[in-house]
């Protein structure tokens, strides 16, 4: 479902490899290999987004939504990794600034679309670029339509924040 949600954005290069098979353990190591290969193949890449949904209440009904116009939209949360876990990550502040820029524009255009940014001690492969983040689109209880609706608004926010 993350691939379907991601396809709703205007993405030039997308890697839809499942890295949590055969187990979630080691998925970030496997995805780092893909990211590095993708960056070599696409050296002009400026933004790296690791698209997730919030797993809080796995299998539960937690569904953070906001109503924008006539649409019920899954809320979006950035997760920013740091070097707090001991791994080198000199770009985390730049990644945080990028997320803040997007969230501020989102709050201006569509109040409630974004949840507060979560900053964590793990680096989540975000050391690969100056605009590398995890974006959690909704949670386990959100419907696919709510998540797809978020992408429509997120695309507009990113266009306004980054291209104007």
Question: Model regions: which residues?
Answer:
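Active-site microenvironments of hydrolase-like enzyme catalytic domains
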Residues: 34, 38-83
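Second-shell loop/turn segments in exported
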Residues: 1, 17-29, 35-38, 64, ...
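Extracytoplasmic/secreted envelope proteins and their assembly/folding machinery
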Residues: 29-36, 96-103, 132, 148-151, ...
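Active-site-adjacent mobile loop/cap segments within catalytic or ligand-binding domains
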Residues: 114-164
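Active-site-adjacent substrate-binding region
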Residues: 91-118
């Amino acid at each position: 479902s993350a691939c379907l949600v991601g396809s709703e954005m205007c993405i030039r290069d997308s890697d839809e490899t499942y890295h949590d098979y055969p187990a979630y353990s080691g998925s970030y190591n496997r995805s780092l290999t893909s990211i590095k290969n993708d960056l070599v193949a696409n050296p002009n890449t400026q933004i790296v987004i690791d698209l997730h949904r919030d797993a809080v209440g796995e299998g539960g009904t937690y569904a953070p939504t906001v109503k924008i116009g006539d649409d019920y939209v899954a809320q979006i949360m950035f997760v920013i990794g740091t070097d707090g876990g001991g791994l080198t990550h000199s770009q985390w502040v730049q990644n945080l600034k990028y997320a803040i820029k997007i969230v501020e524009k989102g709050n201006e255009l569509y109040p409630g679309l974004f949840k507060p940014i979560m900053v964590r001690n793990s680096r989540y492969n975000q050391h690969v670029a100056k605009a590398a983040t995890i974006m959690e689109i909704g949670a386990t209880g959100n419907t696919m339509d709510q998540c797809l609706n978020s992408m429509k608004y997120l695309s507009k926010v990113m266009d306004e924040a980054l291209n104007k």
